[in-house]
């Protein structure tokens, strides 16, 4: 997987289960939207305690790359979509995604990331992206209703809520 600028579908990835699901949704939508999928993640240096990171082998960019590769593996196993690229950028996640939405046809994000406010229906990054992105935004939610015993799970539920 090579790194390059975003074009077709940009997917915000933070390692959360919903960002992995966002990667899966992007693969489902790729042929209809057109263009390749770019899995994008953002990193920042910690604000406090920079002195404790004196090990020159460690860096937040390396952690971001590892997180992104793990999420891609979780989403696609050993068969990522053809043409999948990655984008690892320094800065706040919302800013990175909004900047890269300018060259995209669709931005896909999970409704909740790894932030600390679990009671919110929409996370701060997904809310800011939905408001400011330069392209349409698909916010992927977790299924809210579990299928009854013996019934198949409705894989199109997030798409229906997006299209409604």
Predicted stretch roles:
Residues 88-95:
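Charged docking surfaces used in two-component/phosphorelay signaling
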Residues 75-81:
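Short helix-capping segments at alpha-helix termini
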Residues 106-132, 146-149:
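Glycine-rich, Arg-bearing micro-motifs that act as flexible, cationic patches
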Residues 73, 95, 127:
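Active-site phosphate/pyrophosphate- and oxyanion-stabilizing loops and adjacent acidic/basic residues
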Residues 2-53, 100, 132, 143-145, ...:
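Small/aliphatic-rich secondary-structure junction motif
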Residues 8, 105-106:
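Structural motif
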Residues 83-87:
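A non-catalytic structural micro-motif
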Residues 56-67:
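A short acidic, glycine-rich active-site loop
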């Amino acid at each position: 997987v090579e790194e390059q600028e975003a074009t077709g579908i940009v997917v915000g990835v933070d390692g959360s289960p919903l960002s992995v699901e966002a990667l899966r949704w992007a693969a489902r939508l790729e042929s209809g939207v057109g263009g390749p999928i770019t899995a994008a993640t953002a990193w920042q240096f910690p604000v406090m305690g920079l002195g404790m990171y004196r090990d020159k082998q460690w860096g937040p960019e390396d952690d971001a790359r590892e997180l992104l590769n793990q999420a891609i593996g979780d989403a696609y196993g050993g068969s990522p979509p053809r043409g999948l690229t990655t984008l690892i950028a320094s800065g706040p996640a919302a800013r990175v995604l909004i900047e890269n939405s300018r060259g995209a046809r669709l931005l896909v994000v999970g409704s909740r990331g790894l932030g600390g406010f679990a009671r919110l229906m929409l996370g701060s990054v997904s809310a800011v992206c939905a408001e400011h992105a330069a392209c349409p935004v698909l916010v992927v939610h977790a299924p809210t209703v579990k299928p009854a015993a013996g019934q198949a799970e409705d894989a199109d539920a997030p798409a229906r809520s997006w299209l409604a």
